[in-house]
Amino acid sequence: MASLTRKDRPMAAVKKSVSVKDVARLAGVSEQTVSRTVHDSPSVRPETKERVRAAMRELGYRPNFAGRSLRRGKFKTVGVAMFNITGTGNLDRMEGFAAAADKHGYAITLTKVDGHPYTLESASSRMSALPVDGMVVIMNRMPADFGTFEPLPGMQTVLVTMLEHPLCSTVDNDQFDCSRQVVEYLLRQGHKTVHFISCPERSLSGMQREEGWRETLHAHGIEPPRLVRGDWTAQSGYAAGQALADDPTCTAIYASNDAMAYGCIRGLESRGRRVPEDVSVVGVDDSLGDIVPDRRLTTVRFDNRRVGMWAVDKIAGAEGGASGVEHMLIPGVLVEGDTVRDLR
């Protein structure tokens, strides 16, 4: 049996892509009106917009924003690189990213930074392959190339860190000042010194909180007691509390985060030390108040949502020419609970 030649074969039905012209024809309007409706222009009457949108739905028309972005050289998108997506404060920062992006008509693209050690260059390379106008990097740890990193031309870059970079804008909560506030507060309450539960040495925020603790005690002529190293978890705080419970001179403990502070309280109590009657405890981040109902921890509250909004505002503002490097530190607020005793 002779086979069909290509010429003899019936052609498969080809679905024709829907164009602006098709939508305009069905809606009975101009192509310019369709374009204005897509961008929600106030110059188009509501009833006309509804007619155009009905035609778009009927025809299955989807605006080609990607093509428009390529033509304009702008994607209206900010890339966010995180080392630890579930880290304390990151969800609030994401809320800030989203709120600012919505305000500017931008979208957010999220990527996770891996690698040991990770670098800003690797984050930048990944972002350069994506349709983004700028990137935000949350620096939980010190990148190996922090001192040598140069952002790509046209890639507005904001780093979430207290460390200032000559070529990138930076924003963060003031990790040093939160420790100063805590130590000053406890000393004003009559405590002679402040013990400290630190965190993993690779953590940037933890290092800055430790530095603030040391320098504030030194400023008052007090030699800092030996710190206890934790790992951000309540379990490490529990172990630290048990260890510090055996020190009769310990009347005040400052933990690097709320999880360790709550763990510390349980550790102290397991050894018969009462909080705050025997030992005062203060944390940082105000992240667990809704989760631990039986205790109002004295802590420092951070505005991570504001951090996220500032970062995206900076990148979106670059579209209007505000592209200079800036550095922003947002102070925390000391929130008094029921875990500190006044010894005066």
Residue positions per predicted region:
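N-terminal helix-turn-helix DNA-binding module of bacterial transcription factors
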Residues: 1-75, 344
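Alpha-helical recognition/docking segments in bacterial nutrient-uptake
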Residues: 1-15, 77-184, 188
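Short beta-strand segments enriched in small/hydrophobic residues
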Residues: 26, 33-36, 70-86, 185, ...
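Short acidic/polar active-site loop segments enriched in Thr and Asp
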Residues: 30, 76, 133, 191-194, ...
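Glycine-rich phosphate-binding loop signature in dinucleotide/nucleotide-binding domains
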Residues: 59, 129-131, 189-191, 244-250
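Hinge/beta->alpha junction and helix N-cap segments in small-molecule ligand-binding domains
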Residues: 65, 83-92, 110-119, 141, ...
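Flexible loop/turn connectors
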Residues: 225, 247-344
